[in-house]
Amino acid sequence: MNYDCALFRKSGNKIFSFDAFTRKLLCNFALTKIKQQTIFMKKYVKDLQIAEVEIPREGYILLKMQPIDGILPEIMPGQFVEIQVPDSPTTFLRRPISVNFVDYEKNQLWLLIHAVGDGTKRLAQCQKGDKLNCMFPLGNGFTIPETDGKKVLLVGGGVGTAPLLYFGKTLREAGCEPVFLLGGRTGIDLMQLQDFEQYGRIYVTTEDASMGEKGFVTNHSILTKEKFDSVSTCGPKPMMVAVARWAASVGVPCEASLENLMACGLGACLCCVEKMKDGHNLCVCKEGPVFNTDKLSWLD
């Protein structure tokens, strides 16, 4: 979820700062509303220090960060963080990054970042000890079943697998059975498999057959062998649409975490709107990023 914007300057003047602007928005939009429920979750703007840095594969960086003081607030699976890019005057807008994992024992927040634009490439240069100003937790996350024993299929592709790790952990702690179905072009694209294994069974597809079954996630044999109580997915839109269509065909409720381009992260700039089935447009950053797919216009 990256969004680049041209930098506006006036000769002889300082670069306009959006920090005060975003702080004001934070106060105005702390109440997050969704169609069926209203969730009050306090938002924070604070510096987090990088405690560990890992490179899961070329072009990706895993930052494990912790508050300089205090403890991490409650964070729901599927929510995201807006990071201020340091020392990068051409990227004054924050970058939205999905929450990969929350380790409350170590007081760490994990963010898996794909370095594809100026902002994320700068973030990929961060080192242990660096501090990043973060606004979090933002958006609405995945639905946790109200009763235990539910079997939930978590389908991810590419960097879209990132939020499913924390969701899987949360499901397991809630007494549910998470089952992971992860897809990539090659086996190299599949990251954090050892972490996923701690929380549930893993099934894999690759387009070149280098790992798991060959093909797309919707071609995997597990979909015909087992029944699931619900499905949650995150990844490239074509993949999520295919998963949503499969779920609809077998009568299983499905949620998707959208990765629309975002800027403010609070529903003010309207650059991340998504058309709903009823014709209305909703801000992905505020009303989502997780939506029940039967509310989206995908299946029309």
Each predicted region: which residue ranges?
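Short, surface-exposed secondary-structure boundary micro-motifs
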Residues: 86-88, 137, 277
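Local cysteine-cluster metal-coordination motifs and their immediate loop/turn environment
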Residues: 237, 259-289
